Amino acid sequence: MNKTNPERKISLTSFKERMACKEKPRDLQVLLIISIVLSCSFAVSATVEEANALLKWKSTFTNQTSSSKLSSWVNPNTSSFCTSWYGVACSLGSIIRLNLTNTGIEGTFEDFPFSSLPNLTFVDLSMNRFSGTISPLWGRFSKLEYFDLSINQLVGEIPPELGDLSNLDTLHLVENKLNGSIPSEIGRLTKVTEIAIYDNLLTGPIPSSFGNLTKLVNLYLFINSLSGSIPSEIGNLPNLRELCLDRNNLTGKIPSSFGNLKNVTLLNMFENQLSGEIPPEIGNMTALDTLSLHTNKLTGPIPSTLGNIKTLAVLHLYLNQLNGSIPPELGEMESMIDLEISENKLTGPVPDSFGKLTALEWLFLRDNQLSGPIPPGIANSTELTVLQLDTNNFTGFLPDTICRGGKLENLTLDDNHFEGPVPKSLRDCKSLIRVRFKGNSFSGDISEAFGVYPTLNFIDLSNNNFHGQLSANWEQSQKLVAFILSNNSITGAIPPEIWNMTQLSQLDLSSNRITGELPESISNINRISKLQLNGNRLSGKIPSGIRLLTNLEYLDLSSNRFSSEIPPTLNNLPRLYYMNLSRNDLDQTIPEGLTKLSQLQMLDLSYNQLDGEISSQFRSLQNLERLDLSHNNLSGQIPPSFKDMLALTHVDVSHNNLQGPIPDNAAFRNAPPDAFEGNKDLCGSVNTTQGLKPCSITSSKKSHKDRNLIIYILVPIIGAIIILSVCAGIFICFRKRTKQIEEHTDSESGGETLSIFSFDGKVRYQEIIKATGEFDPKYLIGTGGHGKVYKAKLPNAIMAVKKLNETTDSSISNPSTKQEFLNEIRALTEIRHRNVVKLFGFCSHRRNTFLVYEYMERGSLRKVLENDDEAKKLDWGKRINVVKGVAHALSYMHHDRSPAIVHRDISSGNILLGEDYEAKISDFGTAKLLKPDSSNWSAVAGTYGYVAPELAYAMKVTEKCDVYSFGVLTLEVIKGEHPGDLVSTLSSSPPDATLSLKSISDHRLPEPTPEIKEEVLEILKVALLCLHSDPQARPTMLSISTAFS
């Protein structure tokens, strides 16, 4: 019998216990491995689920192809997609980053997997074409730190739920179409350091809750329509560095609490409606680099405390109502580079302390009431590039060292009381590009006062006291395009070298004492568009070489001593719209060639010795508005064909030997009596108001036999007339009652016929109604922003008739707006430019209201570009001319009209092309006359895709709105289609940004020749400057037009 050994049993038990203790760690390891494997499996499953959710969202995009950046978004079977999918990053088994910026996506957020991506910390969907609204579900991503939906097409309001993003550091919603107010809940984002929601359509106030964002470093709210006052709480943000509230509708005062913002380097609040004084506490912002408060309604003095800001490099206070003197303390801003305080009401002298601004590059003091001499120290800065002092009351001499650094480019001194000689440093200042001395008392010998300027583009020395002869050295200023020396005391002959300045676009030597003859070599300046030599002592023949100046638009040779005939070859000036040869000794007949100047709008040949008859071919001058043939020896009749000259508004034929009836034309009917005096045999109708004798239809001598014959004929006729008169009387009595009823009905319905025409409006009204078949759709040729355009073939001309729509019609029927509208129409009918569609008049009747324009054969530029065959005919040369023509017209509207006219709707649909593809601006339905004493704030107008940001959002009308639209139009002409999103990209690019012409040019055209290509590239550079988001940084149309000339 076996008995168990107790000791053995104990030892066996001890062994098992020991073994069990050794196996416990191994079991834990196994459990841990199993746990890790399971968790990884779950993580892969979770990550794949998130990826599938993104794939489902991608499937809703409307434009994804195999070549798109998202073509890598396939097969999420494993977590490897985290490294292979474009724009996706993962951590700890979950997607945390989604960066799809600039991937060309077209879609919405309706199907975004909000509930499937709980760990997102970074979302960048900017620079795409997302549309629709921002979902409030974005507020669920509590871990989100970076959120960017900028540069899309999002609409609607900013959801208040975004205030729940408690970890958010950066919020960017830039350049969308978001509207409504900024939700106050944004003030709960206590960790946010940057908020950028500029360039939207936001309204309402800036929330005072922004004062809670104590970590905020940068706040960008510019280019919206925000209103109300600026919350003083913003002044309590200790970490704020950049604050941009510009281009809104903010009102009220600048908070004095801004003095607490010790770290702010950039403060932009320009182009608002801020009022009151600039708080002196701004001087406590000692870190400021840029302070821009221009274009507001600020009053009071410039605070002297600004001098405390030693770091300030840019100070823009222009276009306000600041008064008082310039504080000397501004001279203590030793870092100042750009100081602009123009267009205020500042008085007193320029402080001597400005001599301490040794880093100054730009100084703008123009359009104030400043006085006294310019302190010599103003020229101490060797970096001085732009100095604008015009339109003040400055006196004395210019500082001798005004071009000390040799970098001065722009010097504007117009309309002051400067005197004395031109400083030697200016004579030797090779850097000059633009110089204006107009309207002062500068003196000295013109031949010695100026040197050679290799970069000079424009110089105006008019209305001064310069004397002496012109120097031949001007020929060496080879970039000079505008040379204006009128109203001085210049003598001698014009040097022959002047006629070698082939780059000249404008030459004005008028009102001097210049003598000699004009040579045939005048034909060398074949780029000239404006030639003014009037008011001198020039003699001899008018050179026939003028016929070669085919770019000439304006010619004034009046008040000289030219003799002999008018050159018959002057008919070869296709662009000429103004010709004045009056007050000379010209003789012989008026050459037939003048009647071929189809663009001519003003012709003055008065006070000469011209004889012969007036040609009936004058009727060819359908654009002629003013004609003066007075004080000559003209004879014969005024041709009856003058009745067909529909544009004619002013005529003077006095003091000639003319006879016979005056033509049946409104210009003749409305002319004053002195327009016909001195012509003893001129006669008019019985109802004439010009004091002319009635025209007789019988001769003064008749034989007795003839008289008897007449009696035999007249007696029965008179009898018949009496009988007919009785019948007519009965009929008239019957009609009188009917007419009274009709007139009563008309008066009740406001049925007036109101017209502004350069011809008989009532007659034309009936003709137009008939020609358009009472506006039958078969005559419809286009639709504009304010009505439909019809083709009307009248007896003597084809016209375009724009019938205003009911909305526009009802608005102008309001008595409070009618007169303003009619005043604008009158102003527009006076526009005289070859690149502006002529507006003949306006007619308002209870049934129809319409505008009458000249007819353009090829229709709109947009239609031409949309048609492949037509677009190919519009070759590079023609496209260049289109751009230049529009530029010249806008320059005329902005700078040659008083008040200036802003079109506000420059687009390819409003550029019409004639038979020869010459471009003309049309549709002034939204035009605004910039009257100096009126507000320039107006409702939004214009065509989508062409509207300047400040007009679309801030509704501020300036000429720079047209400049922006011109930039878009120029790109469209080059590209052959609207540039679309390229515009917004270029608007935010630096002004010197370059583009590959090949990448954006119209591929329907062959590649341009090297010469043409260079010109197109120059035009492209101008377009980029026009698209600058800051209106003040855009060029003027005058500078563009001059450059194109």
Curated annotation (Swiss-Prot):
Induction: Induced by pathogen elicitors flg22 and elf18.
GO MF annotation, one: peptide binding
PROSITE patterns in the record: LRR, PROTEIN_KINASE_ATP, PROTEIN_KINASE_DOM, PROTEIN_KINASE_TYR
Residues glycosylated per entry: 63, 77, 99, 119, 179, 212, 249, 263, 284, 323, 380, 393, 410, 487, 500, 580, 633, 687
Reactions accelerated catalytically: L-seryl-[protein] + ATP = O-phospho-L-seryl-[protein] + ADP + H(+); L-threonyl-[protein] + ATP = O-phospho-L-threonyl-[protein] + ADP + H(+)
Membrane topology category: Single-pass type I membrane protein
Sequence ranges on the Cytoplasmic membrane side: 731-1045
Span of domain Protein kinase: 775-1045
EC code: 2.7.11.1
Pfam families xrefs: LRR_1, LRR_14, LRR_8, LRRNT_2, Pkinase
Disruption phenotype: Defect in apoplastic reactive oxygen species (ROS) production upon stimulation with some immune elicitors such as flg22 and AtPep1, and in response to SCOOP10 and SCOOP12. Insensitivity to SCOOP peptides including SCOOP4, SCOOP6, SCOOP8, SCOOP10, SCOOP12, SCOOP13, SCOOP14, SCOOP15, SCOOP20 and SCOOP23 leading to the loss of modified gene expression of several genes. Altered activation of MAPK (e.g. MPK3, MPK4 and MPK6) and root meristems distortion triggered by SCOOP10 and SCOOP12.
Cellular compartment(s): Cell membrane
SMART domains referenced in this protein's UniProt entry, alphabetically: LRR_SD22, LRR_TYP
Family note: Belongs to the protein kinase superfamily. Ser/Thr protein kinase family.
Protein name: MDIS1-interacting receptor like kinase 2
The gene coding this protein: MIK2
